[in-house]
């Protein structure tokens, strides 16, 4: 995900932004040199090795995509043992180096890595629930694509709110809330299932060659850029993400968020659900 995400950010971040790449792999500074030849006004540096500190200094937004990817036959929870440790270590460094940064966790299983990050930040005394996000944007862009295909719309005209979590049946697209589009109950059930299983569709199609890295890079870039716009004072920036809420549905829950200068400005209502959606939420 990292390289695709870095390429998109190098091209799309506002002029004057600084982009830092970090990975344990020694290739990372070279990836930054490669990207630095792209003519945009975004400064880029790459860091590798055991110490992430220089990459984090002064950061306003940190996106964590480090970890192992899914292989066929695995679900997102199979990644837990390895990826939990990676996220824990990185977040400990964030707590020390840039405790006020907004942190977006991409590393699966998001439903648990976000909770781990929250505990690490709490232990360090720097947790702000308005600044920690599980990036679920891939579920939204997939929903937009699949709905547009099914209904003959332009994908750019469709925006589907997706609530719940970021794995399997916890992913709940609110298909009933798309203006000007309606679904039969069967269509809604089939489409919901396809959105929930879209990650597996990619894992199987890649036949052992990894998971969704390019579409995830696009999703993470969209979320990161929305955060940057909101931090810079743009109004009415809304994205769905997996955050600690008021505990109405679960401690952590993906819902529409109004973003602002301090991260989450407002956790927006999930609105009125169809009977099918309500049943899925209650389950």
Swiss-Prot record:
InterPro entries found in the cross-reference section: L-lactate/malate_DH (IPR001557), Lactate/malate_DH_C (IPR022383), Lactate/malate_DH_N (IPR001236), Lactate_DH/Glyco_Ohase_4_C (IPR015955), Malate_DH_AS (IPR001252), Malate_DH_type1 (IPR010097), NAD(P)-bd_dom_sf (IPR036291)
Keywords carried by this UniProt record: NAD, Oxidoreductase, Tricarboxylic acid cycle
Keyword Transport among record annotations: no
Binding site for substrate: 70, 76, 108, 142
Binding site for NAD(+): 1-2, 23, 83, 106-108, 216
The protein's enzyme class: oxidoreductase
EC number: 1.1.1.37
GO BP term, example: malate metabolic process
Active site: 166
A GO CC term assigned to this protein in UniProt: cytoplasm
Catalytic activity: (S)-malate + NAD(+) = oxaloacetate + NADH + H(+)
Pfam families assigned: Ldh_1_C (PF02866), Ldh_1_N (PF00056)
SUPFAM superfamilies listed in its UniProt record: LDH C-terminal domain-like (SSF56327), NAD(P)-binding Rossmann-fold domains (SSF51735)
Subunit structure comment from the entry: Homodimer.
Family according to the record: Belongs to the LDH/MDH superfamily. MDH type 1 family.
Role according to the record: Catalyzes the reversible oxidation of malate to oxaloacetate.
Protein name, as recorded: Malate dehydrogenase
Source organism: Salmonella muenchen
